Amino acid sequence: LYPYASKAGQAMLYQKRNASRPFLVEVTRDVSAMGAWCYAVPRRYGDAPLASALLGYLDGEGHGVAGLEAALEDLLSGTGAQDKLVCAVNAQGKLRSGTEPELVKSDSGAVGVQLTLSRSIQRAAEAVAVQTMQSGCILVLDAASAKVRACASTPGFDPENVSASLNAPDSPLVNRAFQAYAVGSVFKPVLAAAALEAGKTGLVWDCPGYCVVDGQVFRCAGGVPHGEVDLAAALQKSCNGYFIRLGQELGPERVREMAVRLGFGRALNLADTLSTAAGQLPEAETLTSSGAFAN
């Protein structure tokens, strides 16, 4: 048994080497032999775990420690099949002669939790994240419903072997999708919404690939000129210069008000004990400098 057990299992085998009472240990292959019986049980996270940072993980006692495993523990603990190994023992606690342990399965009948994630989109997002970044995240939302279709954080971890990641210097247990970031181009729809509400949608900007505000140069991606763009074209091409000019027309108070209404600067609570970082949204009065506001 020893070569096919985990380190924790090997320690248990050593501790129990002279034990007479039945005990359980996890092994990686069928090693049925005299006095040992193997039973196949489903892995909680499957052979290729997905969305580990969002789902979280369990401790050695089967209690949720992080992510949805912790936030929804009361609900999740009552779902799924429950396996019990029943042994007939004598007065000394030894397995009775001529008997074998019996695996008894029962189903709680509870329905569990269904997420909005798409398995295919999640798997694709995780593959792209691993291939293109050392540290970061990819979020995919359904534009029509705002349902989260993918929530990938990299580097990731194996929820079946969390101990291997506990002291890793790149902090794989952190869900980077829930951290605070400089918003970048994600903020452009906020400016567009504020402009639509204020009736200021007529701005046309001849983009040379950059914009100068108080002597500070703000470039479009790669410094590529977009030419003459209106609001729709600026959104399509993600023109930095256009939205800097639009923000100047709207003013910091109007822009900040729309950002607050759309949820910027506050945490999003997804479940008990599971929230995103709030981030920081500066007060309008701190943006008196045109350069600071543009940034």
What are the residue ranges of the model-derived segments?
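Generic short beta-strand
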Residues: 86, 136-139, 149
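Beta-lactam-recognizing serine transpeptidase/beta-lactamase-like catalytic domain environment
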Residues: 92-93, 97-101, 142-185, 190-295
